[in-house]
Amino acid sequence: MAPQLLLCLILTFLWSLPEAESNVFLKSKVANRFLQRTKRANSLYEEFRSGNIERECIEERCSKEEAREVFEDDEKTETFWNVYVDGDQCSSNPCHYRGTCKDGIGSYTCTCLSGYEGKNCERVLYKSCRVDNGNCWHFCKPVQNDIQCSCAEGYLLGEDGHSCVAGGNFSCGRNIKTRNKREASLPDFVQSQNAILLKKSDNPSPDIRIVNGMDCKLGECPWQAVLVDEKEDAFCGGTILSPIYVLTAAHCINQTKMISVVVGEINISRKNPGRLLSVDKIYVHQKFVPPKKGYEFYEKFDLVSYDYDIAILQMKTPIQFSENVVPACLPTADFANQVLMKQDFGIVSGFGRIFEKGPQSKTLKVLKVPYVDRHTCMLSSESPITPTMFCAGYDTLPRDACQGDSGGPHITAYRDTHFITGIVSWGEGCAQTGKYGVYTKVSKFILWIKRIMRQKLPSTESSTGRL
């Protein structure tokens, strides 16, 4: 019985062997999912073959040095290695506004185009008023995380939300008769057209006027106003702000008993009573101190009388605008300080005196003068430069235009619109090297000017007021 049982067990074992084989051994296709054979590197002829990135790093794992041997270039190796180690971080195009992505190990770097910043170039810089004025043509105001553009009076905001479109033929600050190429050729010489502080010249010469200035052609300085006395002699300048308001210097007000205004003229040699505009009311800044009695305009200087040196004339009848008579635009304080006064140049114009105590120039002159750094301005002056003043001009020329157009305009152009930035006020000496023209800083008085211009007073007898 026992031999029969043993035989049965042996037969059963032999019968089960094929089944066991099918359970232990997998088909090659299935087995390759789990087991992969790597081709052996550095075979007998490996070192004699040129580098191949597929053989070195794709078919087998390679080191950075091995990759370097293939590329033979550090930059190409670095680019490959950053992707090889952990994939391409730039594949999702993380850099906005056409920024350029550079992959790194576990990171990436965006190189932004001009005007954009942030890790992903996601911040548009011109949405800050501090950068290119927010791309606004006139005024820029920050609003939460954005900016808001607006325009000077008489202009409409363009559909793009940045540009300003003139709403009429005689909108402020428009130089209708453009200077074309003459603008670029305006002389870069300082002629501080003021000479309130004067020393007598040893050799007065008829050539000393707005030195190297150019004639301002008809319509090129349309905001220029001239203050004349009862004899129609010009004694100060002014700037047209609106049909009934003209800006000037406060120290001009006490120079004559009667003030009339002339506009639209480039030659004042001919008397013409019909062109005179009567002044209805005069507003002098409340902090301006008039010169003392017995004050001689050319020989004495009282600094107190030149701080807050600003006044506004109100006309009895409106000024008629034309292509030769246009007001200058009034800026906001921020726009003037942060944009206009950071330009290279301003433009001054006037009928400057020919020489010290000499007659006025009969033709209107214009020139551009650079803004002067405040610290340099203060160091150059023996008299204090107050916060209501700024300097413009050069320090190297030995001549300037003594006793010119006090009260006249200092204009700064921005995107083809001309804004009032200063009033010709005073200067130390005449033709002195290292000295600059000093101007009333209009940005300090924007609210004061607007408060006066909002008034609509009935016509009254000519009078002088203080506000």
UniProtKB/Swiss-Prot annotation:
Expression by tissue? Expressed by the venom gland.
Residue(s) carrying 4-carboxyglutamate: E46, E47, E54, E56, E59, E60, E65, E66, E69, E72, E75
Please tell me the species this chain comes from: Oxyuranus scutellatus (Coastal taipan)
What is the name attached to this protein's record? Venom prothrombin activator oscutarin-C catalytic subunit
Question: What reaction does this enzyme carry out catalytically?
Answer: Selective cleavage of Arg-|-Thr and then Arg-|-Ile bonds in prothrombin to form thrombin
Q: Name one GO biological process term.
A: blood coagulation
> What is the role of the protein in this entry?
Snake prothrombin (F2) activator that attacks the hemostatic system of prey. This catalytic subunit is functionally similar to blood coagulation factor Xa. For prothrombin activation, it requires a non-catalytic subunit present in the venom, which is similar to coagulation factor Va, to be fully active. In contrast to the 8 other snake venoms tested, this protein is the only one to also activate factor VII (F7). However, in contrast to prothrombin activation, the factor Va-like subunit is not essential for this activation.
Q: How does it assemble?
A: Heterodimer of a light and a heavy chains; disulfide-linked. Is associated with oscutarin-C non-catalytic subunit (AC Q58L91) in a non-covalent manner.
- Where is the protein localized? Secreted
Family from the record: Belongs to the peptidase S1 family. Snake venom subfamily.
SMART domains, per database record: EGF, EGF_CA, GLA, Tryp_SPc
One annotated GO molecular function is: toxin activity
Q: Which UniProt keywords apply?
A: Blood coagulation cascade activating toxin, Calcium, Cleavage on pair of basic residues, Disulfide bond, EGF-like domain, Gamma-carboxyglutamic acid, Glycoprotein, Hemostasis impairing toxin, Hydrolase, Protease, Prothrombin activator, Repeat, Secreted, Serine protease, Signal, Toxin
Tell me, what's a Pfam family for it? FXa_inhibition
Is Glycoprotein tagged as a keyword? yes
Q: Which domain of life is it from?
A: Eukaryota
Disulfide pairs? C57-C62, C90-C101, C95-C110, C112-C121, C129-C140, C136-C149, C151-C164, C172-C329, C216-C221, C236-C252, C377-C391, C402-C430
- Post-translational modification, as annotated: Gamma-carboxyglutamate residues are formed by vitamin K dependent carboxylation. These residues are essential for the binding of calcium.
Q: What is its main location?
A: secreted
Anything further noted?
Is classified in the group C of snake venom prothrombin activators, since it does not require the mammalian factor Va for the cleavage of prothrombin as the venom contains its own non-catalytic factor Va-like molecule. In contrast to blood coagulation factors that circulate as inactive zymogen in plasma, venom prothrombin activators are always found in the active form in the venom. Hence, catalytic and non-catalytic subunits are found naturally in venom as stable complexes.
What InterPro entries does the record point to?
Coagulation_fac-like_Gla_dom, EGF-like_Ca-bd_dom, EGF-like_dom, EGF-type_Asp/Asn_hydroxyl_site, EGF_Ca-bd_CS, GLA-like_dom_SF, GLA_domain, Pept_S1A_FX
Please list which residues make up the signal peptide: 1-20
What the entry lists under SUPFAM superfamilies is as follows: GLA-domain, Trypsin-like serine proteases
The residues of the propeptide are 21-40, 182-209
Kindly identify the residues recorded as the active site. H251, D309, S406
Q: Where is the Peptidase S1 domain?
A: 210-454
Q: How is this protein's activity kept under control?
A: Activated by calcium and negatively charged phospholipids.
